[in-house]
Amino acid sequence: TGLIASSFAGCAKVNYVTEGAIKAIHQIKDGSWKKQAEGEKAGSSEDTSVLEKSFEAGKYGGVEFKSLEDVANYYKEAYDYTKTLTAEYVNDKGQTETFYKLLGDEKINVGKVMIDGKENAVINKLVPGIVDGLFKPNIYGLVPCNNRNPKLDNYNCNEKDPGKKDFRKSYVKGEDVLDANITDNGDGTITMVIQPKAAEMSMRGEDSQGDFFEVLGDISATVAQIDVISFAQGTAEDNIKVTYKGGTVTCTINTKTKEITKAEYDMVAEVAVNHANVAVIKDKSASLLIKYKNTFPASDEVTMKARQFKRK
C-alpha cells in the first residue's frame, strides 16, 4: 500500500491519499500480498479514440469546424473568455469574495490496483475506502487551475509573481487533440467532446494532457522523500511512470458569447511503480488506475459543503 501511496504523492490536490495509504500498510497482513488472484495485465499502450463518434468537419451552431485544430482553437477561445468572467460569493462569515463565475468540484476514483501484474482483491477493496474517507474536495475554476481567485490562478499562486504559467489562459494547441466531436444543441449552444493525445509524466500547461487536465505533476520527486519507500534498483525517477490516456473533456459553449456554461473533465491516469521496497515487501511492482473528474458548474450546496461559500 506504500506503493499506492507513492502513486499519489506528487499531486497537491490528491496527496491526502499518501498518508492514508501508508497507514493502510498496517491494516493488511503480509500474507494478503501473497494471495494474489490472477488479474488482467495492464492496458494496451496504443492511443486510440474512445469517443462514440469521431470528428466530422462541418458547421455546428453556425460555427465552421474544418479540422481538429479548429476544435482546439475554439476551445481555447472559449476557455480564455470564460476565465475573464467573475462573480461575487458570500462565505460563512458573511464576507463577500470574488471568484470565477464558473466554478467546479472534483471527485476521484482509484481502482484496478495490481501487484506484480496481478489484481489483489484485498487491496482493491481497501483503497477506495481510504480514498473516500480522506478526500476533501476543493472548488476550482476551469482546469488546469491553481486557484478559484483569478488573481492567484497562476504557477506560484501569487498576484505579483505569477511564475512561468498563467492559468487564466489555455495552453491548448491543435497538436494536443487526438479526436473530437461536436453536437449542435439547437438552442444557441454546441457541445464539444475532446480527447487529448496520451502523455506521460504530464505537467500543467506543458503537454497534451496537462493543457486540458489537472494532472498529477512530478510524482517521483516527492516519492523520493517518503521514508518508508525505497527502491531495489534505480531511483524514484527511474521507477515511477504515470501514463495519461483515454480521458475526455465535454463542454457546452454558447456560440454567441463563446462562454462555457457547463463542462466535465474526465482524466484517466495509470500510475506504475517498479522495484519498490515497502517494509517487509521487497522489489515489488504495483500499478493503479486513477479516474479524476471535475464537474462545472458546482451548485451552492456543493461549494458550501466543500469550502463554506455560495453565490451572492
Mark where each language-model region is.
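Subset-of-secretome marker
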Residues: 13-312
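Sec-dependent N-terminal signal peptides of Gram-positive bacterial secreted proteins and lipoproteins
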Residues: 1-15
